[in-house]
Amino acid sequence: MENDDPQKLMPEPRIFVERTLALIKPDAIHKTDEIEDIILQSGFTILQKRRLQLSPEQCSDFYAEHYGKLHFPHLTAFMSSGPVVALALARDQAIATWKAIMGPVSSIKARETHPDCLRARFGTCDLRNAVHGSETFSAAEREIRFMFPHSVIEPIPMGEAAKDYLSRFINPTLLVGLTELCKIKPEDPYTWLADWLMNNNPNKPKVLDGAAVEEAA
């Protein structure tokens, strides 16, 4: 049947993953669990998490783009006044989505215009506004490296590079799996396909005498 054509079962896969940095500031540290729940319910994956106490010098480096502004001394003093929680987040349109969840910079304005956002719920003013988020893709990359200096941030395939990656490494295996799915017609196709992909991952290491060994190149 035409509907059984595996190539027509789903649209062409695309890569949308984006990363951003979220900071839970000292004034909202007691709300960490609640904020993390909101993050996860919003479709984010928490790639890394770290609780730390920043020094005034570290705060100055992190907020270097604010240097020379009137609020800069107050910002660095506040951010070094207590522990913060740094979170490396990932999902499609992560930067824009996290900014929307945070709401306006001013918690006072946020309570008037976006009463359900994090800054309206957990912040008190422009300075003590509960959370921070990366403004741009380049800022996210820099801030994640700042908070997680030992992490390796692989470049995300985009545009033609993403299409090439999918056509070379993903689509061939996926097409075989979908073909088998159409033949077998399991009761739970999603679970069946997930298990099939796990068992037929071409990059899965071979196991020999209890030890995992990679195939020779």
From Swiss-Prot:
Disruption phenotype: Morpholino knockdown of the gene in embryos results in ciliopathic phenotypes, including a ventrally curved trunk, small eyes, otolith defects, hydrocephalus, and reversed heart looping. In the spine of mutant animals, the cilia of the central canal form normally and there are no changes in the length or number of cilia, indicating that the gene is not required for ciliary development. However, the beating movement of motile cilia is rarely observed in mutant animals. GO terms for cellular component: cilium. GO terms for biological process: cilium movement; CTP biosynthetic process; GTP biosynthetic process; negative regulation of oxidative stress-induced intrinsic apoptotic signaling pathway; UTP biosynthetic process. Functions as part of axonemal radial spoke complexes that play an important part in the motility of sperm and cilia. Does not seem to have nucleoside diphosphate kinase (NDPK) activity. Exhibits a 3'-5' exonuclease activity with a preference for single-stranded DNA, suggesting roles in DNA proofreading and repair. This is Nucleoside diphosphate kinase homolog 5. Coiled coil: none annotated. It is an enzyme of class 3 (hydrolase). It holds the Pfam family NDK. Belongs to the NDK family. PANTHER family: NUCLEOSIDE DIPHOSPHATE KINASE, NUCLEOSIDE DIPHOSPHATE KINASE HOMOLOG 5. Residues 18-151 are annotated as: NDK. It comes from the Eukaryota. Its main location: other. Gene3D superfamilies: cAMP-dependent protein kinase regulatory subunit, dimerization-anchoring domain, Nucleoside diphosphate kinase-like domain. Its EC number is 3.1.-.-. The gene is nme5. It comes from Danio rerio. The lineage of its organism: Eukaryota, Metazoa, Chordata, Craniata, Vertebrata.
